[in-house]
């Protein structure tokens, strides 16, 4: 029988102890003391940062929003029903990040950037912080390039430039989403990448939007970020910031991007819900005191940045190119009340607003743009030459027509000049109507506006304006394709182009029916 050597055994044990790497890691952990309505109170997380990701058991994450003396209030980004009092919570030392890059184009993702379209994983090479500081004054460049929405009424009267924030505001069912989707569809030839953020909407509505983008081929250059009505308030609050980060990826690399927030009223409601559950003091309309900052820090990130900023950001890889992120936030009003708390906030943050009116919508004027109180504060500098030259009198004609039409109801006999003005206004109103999902190119808009300005519509019955426009544009594409291409390519306006447009109108009216 083999004899055991105690010295050998003790040496082996000593060797094992010396070789043992316990791998002690310092972890900042706390204990959940309360869970309710998607809000978690955690005791013991002393080093938590504001906005830091908190990890719970079962791979559930949260975000620290309230840093109190002896506890941390966090919102749960996911299913809070999995959490229980007494479970551990850990600091991650990371601020919330989402995947960014061209890999997200053509995909539908949730507020955290996870794919929800059943097309497999997104192999994004980069992630970026959801909350970022907007570019400073020195890094910016003035807005002087257009974003064509394809709407005659918008591109002529309320032009939008690259890097602008233009609010779309109106009651429910006035065509706000339709206008934003058309603006995305109109970017097919412009090279502008798009992000559509759906906040607090029904899933069926979002599915219809995605289907329409797919049918028109617009999904190829668009990312859809979804935080539907059935998702926690925390995700509805974060979704716009996530979408903005995805859009900024293109802006910072010298490209142009367009982001639609549909709509920020629901984000404000979600943030109000979170704030009240975190026991923050309510203010006007029960919104928290920082609801203005909620939207201002988001919309300030939409900007046009100069070539020096892009060159510095890309470490000299992209030289001599400016980048832009254009925002179209949507706000829903109640009974046309634009002086409510959130609408006035967003109006004061943005560079103009397109006001859609339910009375115009119901009377068949679609898009239902109220030309009187819709403005674009910086877009005028970005308008293309031909549209700027031709569209000068349209806003005036419409505003005067509305005023005179109201006055004419009470007057029995009108002088010829007034009657002429009313007739012209009626035709311009009819001309500004446009079908959904049919954005118009620069040449198409220029052709029909020229016809209106030069009096070619004066003898066309009002009810036939639409069919005249369709037939004339068909004729222009068939017979004057070179002229249309020249206008689209150069966007210039000179005597030669004016003469050719005039000749084409005279020929069309003589030889074609409508």
Swiss-Prot record:
PROSITE patterns assigned: ATPASE_ALPHA_BETA (PS00152)
EC id: 7.1.2.2
UniProt-annotated site: Required for activity, residues: 374
The reaction(s) this protein catalyses: ATP + H2O + 4 H(+)(in) = ADP + phosphate + 5 H(+)(out)
Transmembrane segments: none
Membrane topology: Peripheral membrane protein
Keywords of this entry: ATP synthesis, ATP-binding, Cell inner membrane, Cell membrane, CF(1), Hydrogen ion transport, Ion transport, Membrane, Nucleotide-binding, Translocase, Transport
Family listed: Belongs to the ATPase alpha/beta chains family.
Protein task: Produces ATP from ADP in the presence of a proton gradient across the membrane. The alpha chain is a regulatory subunit.
Subunit structure: F-type ATPases have 2 components, CF(1) - the catalytic core - and CF(0) - the membrane proton channel. CF(1) has five subunits: alpha(3), beta(3), gamma(1), delta(1), epsilon(1). CF(0) has three main subunits: a(1), b(2) and c(9-12). The alpha and beta chains form an alternating ring which encloses part of the gamma chain. CF(1) is attached to CF(0) by a central stalk formed by the gamma and epsilon chains, while a peripheral stalk is formed by the delta and b chains.
Protein name: ATP synthase subunit alpha
Organism for this UniProt entry: Psychrobacter arcticus (strain DSM 17307 / VKM B-2377 / 273-4)
């Amino acid at each position: 029988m083999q004899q055991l050597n105690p010295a050998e055994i003790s040496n082996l044990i000593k060797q094992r102890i010396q070789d043992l790497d316990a791998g002690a890691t310092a972890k900042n952990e706390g204990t959940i003391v309360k869970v309710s309505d998607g809000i978690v109170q955690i005791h013991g997380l002393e080093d938590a940062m504001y906005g830091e990701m908190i990890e719970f058991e079962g791979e559930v994450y949260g975000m620290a929003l309230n840093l109190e003396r002896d506890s941390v209030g966090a919102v749960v980004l996911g299913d809070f029903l999995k959490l229980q009092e007494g479970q551990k919570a850990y600091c991650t030392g990371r601020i919330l990040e989402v995947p960014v890059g061209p890999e997200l184009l053509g995909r539908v993702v949730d507020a955290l950037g996870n794919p929800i379209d059943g097309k497999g994983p997104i192999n994004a090479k980069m992630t970026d912080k959801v909350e970022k500081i907007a570019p400073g004054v020195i890094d910016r460049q003035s807005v002087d390039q257009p974003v064509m929405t394809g709407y005659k009424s918008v591109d002529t009267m309320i032009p939008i430039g690259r890097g602008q924030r233009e609010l779309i505001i109106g009651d429910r069912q006035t065509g706000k989403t339709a206008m934003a989707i058309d603006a995305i569809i109109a970017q097919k030839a412009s090279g502008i990448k798009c992000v559509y953020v759906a906040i607090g909407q029904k899933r069926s509505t979002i599915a219809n939007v995605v289907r329409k983008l797919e049918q028109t081929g617009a999904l190829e250059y668009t990312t859809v970020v979804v935080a539907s009505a059935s998702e926690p308030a925390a995700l509805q609050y974060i979704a716009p910031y996530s979408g903005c980060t995805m859009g900024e990826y293109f802006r910072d690399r010298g490209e142009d991007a367009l982001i639609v927030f549909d709509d920020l009223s629901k984000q404000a409601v979600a943030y109000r819900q979170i704030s009240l559950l975190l026991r923050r003091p309510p203010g006007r309309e029960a919104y928290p005191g920082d609801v203005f900052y909620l939207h201002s820090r988001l919309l300030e990130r939409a900007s046009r940045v100069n070539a020096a900023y892009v060159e510095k950001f890309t470490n000299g890889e992209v030289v001599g190119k400016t980048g832009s992120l254009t925002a179209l936030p949507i706000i829903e009003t109640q009974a046309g009340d634009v002086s409510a708390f959130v609408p006035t906030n967003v109006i004061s943050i943005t560079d103009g607003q397109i006001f859609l009116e339910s009375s115009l919508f119901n009377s068949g004027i679609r898009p239902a743009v109220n030309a009187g109180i819709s403005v674009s504060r910086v877009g005028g500098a970005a308008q293309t030459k031909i549209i700027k030259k031709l569209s000068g009198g349209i806003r005036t004609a419409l505003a005067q027509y509305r005023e005179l039409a109201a006055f004419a109801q009470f007057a029995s006999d009108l002088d010829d000049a007034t009657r002429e003005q009313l007739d012209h206004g009626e035709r311009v109103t009819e001309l500004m109507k446009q079908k959904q999902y049919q954005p118009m190119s620069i040449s198409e808009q220029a052709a029909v506006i020229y016809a209106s300005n030069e009096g070619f519509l004066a003898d066309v019955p009002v009810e036939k304006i639409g069919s005249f426009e369709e037939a004339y544009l068909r004729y222009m594409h068939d017979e004057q394709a070179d002229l249309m291409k020249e206008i689209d390519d150069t966007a210039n306006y000179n005597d030669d182009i004016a003469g050719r447009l005039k000749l084409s109108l005279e020929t069309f009216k003589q030889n074609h029916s409508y």
